[in-house]
Amino acid sequence: MEVNNRVVVGMSGGVDSSVTAYLLKEQGFEVIGVTMRVWVDPYGKARDDDKSCCSLKAIHDAKKVAEILGIPHYTVNLSEVFYDKIVKYFIDEYLKGRTPNPCVFCNRFIKFGDLLEKAHELGAYYIATGHYVRKEYDEDRKRYLLKKGLDFKKDQSYMLYRLTQEQLKHALFPLGNYTKEEVRALAEKIGLPVADKRESQEICFIPDNDYKAFIKRQIKKDVKPGEFRDIHGNFLGYHKGIINYTIGQRKGLGLSSDRPLYVVDIDPENNVVIVGHQEDVWGEELISSNNNFISIEKLEEEIKVTAKIRYTAKEDEAIIKPYGDDKVLVRFLRPQRAITPGQSVVFYDGDVVVGGGIIEKKVR
């Protein structure tokens, strides 16, 4: 497709995507709003309040903003593909004793994958979202770079580390140079009804943030209980099913001990949850798989980066190097708490996203 000034904005009904659409229209783009309804709860548990990005209220808000801005708006039902690509993955990971982050895959396959397809159907070269990140093209590397948003408190680059060069080529991020406060102020100034709308904090398809109940409803059976063992293999008691536990967890174990106990590992093959003390939760090395690189095509040698092992974690210095078959060995210079299989580890060079992968296991 030839470059043109038509852009499809993924509109969630929130303030960020609404201001994104406004800014692009002000810049002279031909803006089309598209809201993707990715989740319709068959059990009727899904929230329909203003916090849920999948609710009817969210669709109504997006349409209202589009009317105010004078742009066309479409709603696309992607619930089936979302279930196949994201929800099944989420459930399978928990049943394997891992703690997934479905949002990173939703961004890759739905918000930037399916949205880009829809954009091309509508004759648009570009897609845009309300993420707080920046993009630039590096002439020397001949690659598009993903950079942190200037508002480091709202930076969402961790969630977008799986984007491809093709997706970045077509992506626009107007909010990358704004703070959240500036975005809300602008929305209020231009009279958008979502200026003070609360942000959605939970996973969009998990009612009341109760993922355990969600999984049980989806698999239509109870999870199998198993054994608690300590790091030396000693039997300590019985657990209620591995989906109820994550690395670093202390509450809800139901075990008595003279010192606090924490989940330090999960053995899904034997249905065993391994517990230890606070010092056993920390680690310095991990292996990541299913890696995706942005600033480089492939990791071919050892490099020094900063990295973080979950969205809310602080970055810390680390060395990454190729390991076996397309895996990466990550060695932190300082111990990290609760290295959790299934979560993403993301690598940075300053404010540039190098890449990242899914944590496979803690090495030590």
Swiss-Prot record:
Q: Which UniProt keywords apply?
A: ATP-binding, Cytoplasm, Disulfide bond, Nucleotide-binding, RNA-binding, Transferase, tRNA processing, tRNA-binding
Q: Where is this region: Interaction with tRNA?
A: 154-156, 310-311
Give the record's GO CC terms: cytoplasm
EC numbers listed for it are 2.8.1.13
Q: State which residue ranges cross the membrane.
A: none
Q: Where in the cell is it found?
A: Cytoplasm
A molecular function annotated in GO for this UniProt entry is: tRNA-uridine 2-sulfurtransferase activity
Q: Which residues form the active site?
A: 106, 204
Q: Could you tell me which cysteines form disulfide bridges? A: 106-204
| SUPFAM superfamilies from the UniProt entry | Adenine nucleotide alpha hydrolases-like
Q: Which reaction does it catalyse?
A: S-sulfanyl-L-cysteinyl-[protein] + uridine(34) in tRNA + AH2 + ATP = 2-thiouridine(34) in tRNA + L-cysteinyl-[protein] + A + AMP + diphosphate + H(+)
Marked site (Interaction with tRNA) residue numbers:
131, 343
Q: What's a GO biological-process term for it?
A: tRNA wobble position uridine thiolation
**Top EC class of this enzyme:** transferase
Q: One Pfam family from the UniProt entry?
A: tRNA_Me_trans_C
Where would you say this protein principally sits, based on its record? cytoplasm
Q: Where does ATP bind?
A: 10-17, 36, 130
Q: Which family does it belong to?
A: Belongs to the MnmA/TRMU family.
Described purpose of this protein according to its UniProt entry: Catalyzes the 2-thiolation of uridine at the wobble position (U34) of tRNA, leading to the formation of s(2)U34.
What is the name of this protein?
A: tRNA-specific 2-thiouridylase MnmA 1
Organism listed in the record: Caldanaerobacter subterraneus subsp. tengcongensis (strain DSM 15242 / JCM 11007 / NBRC 100824 / MB4) (Thermoanaerobacter tengcongensis)
Q: What is the lineage of its organism?
A: Bacteria, Bacillati, Bacillota, Clostridia, Thermoanaerobacterales
